Amino acid sequence: MRCPFCAAEETKVVDSRLAADGYQIRRRRECTSCKERFTTFESAELVVPYVIKNNGNRVPSDANKLRVSLSRALEKRPVSADDLEKAISKIIIQLQSTGEREVPSKLVGSLAMDALKQLDKVAYIRFASVYLSFDDIEEFTKEIEKLRE
């Protein structure tokens, strides 16, 4: 791998360890020419399926859109950014593991709701109220009762 500092072609791996719950390898490298050190991450390249929207449109999976949606539900809740990123990674891995080239948006929403249910019940209700299009307080109450079971 080329050195990002001096563009020399020779670098050596100084340290390797697992990262991202074992789905990546983090490597510390050292340039043999300039002796600068830098970090690289290695992961399997898996195809993330397209999402089929309710209107039939097909769009690429978008981790940032998922991050924004989950972050909005988790706003001012005691959930770390690291836990959020782990949840997003888990959802993406679940989508990849379907082996499908296209998945319905309902699957993405369902996986997001499952993740939020594990992270924070209040965030789950916030997300569900939008995702399930709650019209009145009764629908909130029913969903809260499901959580209590």
From Swiss-Prot:
GO biological process: negative regulation of DNA-templated transcription
Cofactor note: Binds 1 zinc ion.
Zinc finger (unnamed): 3-34
Pfam families for this protein: ATP-cone, Zn_ribbon_NrdR
InterPro entries registered for this protein in UniProt: ATP-cone_dom, NrdR-like_N, RNR_NrdR-like
Alphabetized UniProt keyword annotations: ATP-binding, DNA-binding, Metal-binding, Nucleotide-binding, Repressor, Transcription, Transcription regulation, Zinc, Zinc-finger
Function noted in UniProt: Negatively regulates transcription of bacterial ribonucleotide reductase nrd genes and operons by binding to NrdR-boxes.
Family to which the UniProt record says this protein belongs: Belongs to the NrdR family.
Signal peptide: none
Residues annotated as domain ATP-cone: 49-139
Protein origin, superkingdom: Bacteria
Required cofactor names: Zn(2+)
Protein name, UniProt field: Transcriptional repressor NrdR
GO MF annotation, one: zinc ion binding
